[in-house]
Amino acid sequence: MKTFTCQCNHTIHFTNTKCIACNAILGFIPEDLQLTALTITNEGLYKVATNDNLYKQCKNYWHHDVCNWMVPHDDPNDLCQSCRLNVTIPNLEKPENLNLWYRMETSKRALLFTLFKLNLPVISRLVEPKTGLGFSFLEDQIEDEYGNELTVKNYVVTGHSAGLITLNLNEALDSTRIEMREKMNERYRTLIGHFRHESGHYYWDRLIKNSSLIEPFRKLFGDERLSYTQSLEQYYQNGPADNWQNVWISAYASMHPWEDWAETWAHYLHMVDTLETANNYEISI
């Protein structure tokens, strides 16, 4: 992730809400893709330090402190472009969930920053209720508890369906995610990695499905009409293809053409963000 510069010329970072040098309130302006210093007006609105544009804080900024994005002052929606994509948020009656939700939101905003920079369409379910992009952060339902052992009644599977990306809240818990990373032999099982991968499925539906690109896709990635369920069962029973290192970008990519696309998409976004960071710090290769 690139860094930004405060009005006082101090370096500020994507998730910052206050400049530690001059104490200026900070807010991210999605339409400008800039984190900037703000001044508060007598009416309780926020003005960008470099112009007269007026904004209000996202509700999840001032109410929950899990966001730092701004909303145009005359926008009837109290949520920013990122938070209004949420379909389900965690149960905040559990105090520990607030920090896990913060981690989810941080990764989601990092993904959206890249998608906006690439000029990719981000259409919410407020606009397209059945196919728009949305996010649900869900917990496993615990049926019973015996000492340190938990009985899971309903396990939340991270995935994508018709624009809705569901993420298991446990993925924001480092210890649980790392345990699963080792168990599943997934080197890039990270929170931002999940967002990038699942967004790949959304953009397959948005850009490839039923378009002129479907045949070039099949030529490069394979025929997606192959049974996904059978491919999934075969992958977990027998493991990846023997020669996957020579053909696919990851073991999981060898499972089915849809996963090959999503893994390739995610790794492309990995590289885009890595190169942007390197360029920001003037690192040459």
Give, region by region, the residue ranges found by the protein language model:
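Auxiliary, metal-adjacent structural segments of Zn-dependent hydrolase domains
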Residues: 103-174
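Catalytic Zn2+-binding segment of zinc metalloproteases
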Residues: 199-216
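Short pre-active-site segment immediately N-terminal to the catalytic Zn-binding motif
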Residues: 174-195
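Hydrophobic (often cysteine-bearing) scaffold residues that line and stabilize catalytic clefts
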Residues: 103, 107, 188, 192, ...
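Fold-level signature of zinc-dependent metallopeptidase catalytic domains
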Residues: 88-89, 93-104
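Short Cys/His-rich micro-motifs in 6-15 aa windows
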Residues: 23-33, 82-91
